[in-house]
């Protein structure tokens, strides 16, 4: 809201009001992110307990040679997923940039005499969002299956807590840095 007020050259008093609203919104978002991350962590732990119970593993010893590789691999999964997601956003953004460049080659659009084709931009964004998330989603869904088939239930019992702990730390870090960037 503050950016819109500034770009539209509204008075200083309007900007003060929008700054207060922005601060309230940022605080609410930060609290909401904390609750979301915490609840996701607890749900993941509950699902892990259900997995261990279902496959009848009496105890999970992290020093076991079948568990430790899974723990290390699981710890890398959230970072791998995040890297794939960020790369996907870059690819989708370039698709959009290329479409906008194509439209601005029409001098009528560039000079404001003709409306741009907004629908093609929406289609590109939707298609890119769906296509580019196939690989990251496959990583998340197929990793436990592949690890379980190749290495067994004990390695999966290591992989899952590795990804839970690493994922929570990554989520907290991303939430805090995102909040800092938002307020910069």
Regions picked out by a protein language model, each given a short descriptive name:
Residues 1-184:
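Hydrophobic packing and interface segments
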């Amino acid at each position: 809201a503050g950016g819109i007020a500034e770009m539209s050259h509204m008075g200083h008093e309007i900007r003060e009001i929008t700054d207060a609203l922005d601060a309230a919104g940022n605080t609410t978002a930060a609290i909401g992110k904390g609750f979301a991350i915490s609840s996701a962590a607890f749900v993941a732990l509950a699902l892990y307990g259900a997995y261990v119970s279902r496959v009848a593993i009496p105890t999970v010893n992290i020093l076991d040679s079948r568990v430790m590789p899974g723990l290390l691999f699981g710890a890398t999964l959230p970072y791998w997923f995040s890297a794939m997601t960020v790369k996907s956003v870059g690819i989708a953004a370039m698709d959009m940039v290329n479409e906008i460049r194509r439209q601005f080659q029409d001098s009528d659009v560039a000079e404001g005499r003709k409306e741009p084709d907004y629908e093609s931009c929406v289609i590109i964004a939707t298609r890119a969002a769906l296509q580019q998330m196939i690989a990251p989603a496959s990583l998340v869904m197929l990793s436990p299956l592949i690890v379980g088939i190749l290495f067994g239930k004990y390695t999966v019992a290591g992989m899952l807590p590795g990804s839970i702990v690493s994922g929570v730390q990554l989520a907290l870090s991303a939430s805090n840095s995102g909040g800092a960037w938002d307020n910069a």
